[in-house]
Amino acid sequence: MQINFKFFFLFISLSIIWFSCSKEKDTEITVTEKNLKEDTIVSIVEIESFAQSIYIDLLGRKATRVEIDAIFNELKPTNASRESRYTIIKDIIGTNEYYDKLYLYNIAEYLNGADENTVYDQRLQLVYIKQLGEQDNNQVLIEFAQNGINRLDSVIVIPERLKQKVFSEDEMQKRLANNAIYDDINMGVPNFTFSIFESFLFRAPTNQEWQNAQNICNTIGGVLFGINGQTKPDFLDIIFSSDHYFEGKVINAYLRFVERRPNSLEQYQGTVDLIDSKDFQSLYLTILSSDEYFKR
């Protein structure tokens, strides 16, 4: 039988083309499935990293497996949308554990690494000094010690007052700057006033501001930010109610959570919102729910 070689070669060529296309299709499917699988793995890693970051930053501890799974189950259906992240963070901010950590973070930050035991130890020392004053009928010593005790007591009650929403972070930080521990760290009026500007306003005072601040604390009297003051409590009231303080809080929040200073728009908007609402948690929610924080 005679073979039609022309037809035979055509058949072979078509078979090769069909086989090649089939292989390419198989390969394409495999690659696509592989990419989807890799994307899913990355998504899981990102969500777990986000969960751990939130718990460490807000509660000072790592999230448990149960907590991570709960966050994953809430974020996965929305592809970790900003709205779903916002909801998760809002559920954490405002809990009792959050306020306890907020207090401990601040006393460590502003009282040179102090903890609750440091505060109670300092109070015991003042109680002992008061007892010595009472034994010697030394009224000056008694009043000095009692004043110190009262100021530390105002620090000790901070966590409960925050939970009860009696006051917010501005009052907490004012109390942390007005006690024997802070005084010992920043001894003398020049050091004390300068440290207040650096620690809470995130800038150094101008020479005029520094001099006026010292005059107020030394009861000479002066004007700071357009407000008259005569005493150290007056100075602290002026600082912690000023627009400059809220500017500093915005700077502090960005440095703490995304390790940079806010840009001009972020600084302006954050400060205006804080001055208007005194809602520090809203500022934190804005930063913590951002894509920048999620992807850092």
Regions found by a protein language model. Give the residues of each.
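Composition-driven recognition of low-complexity segments enriched
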Residues: C21-R296
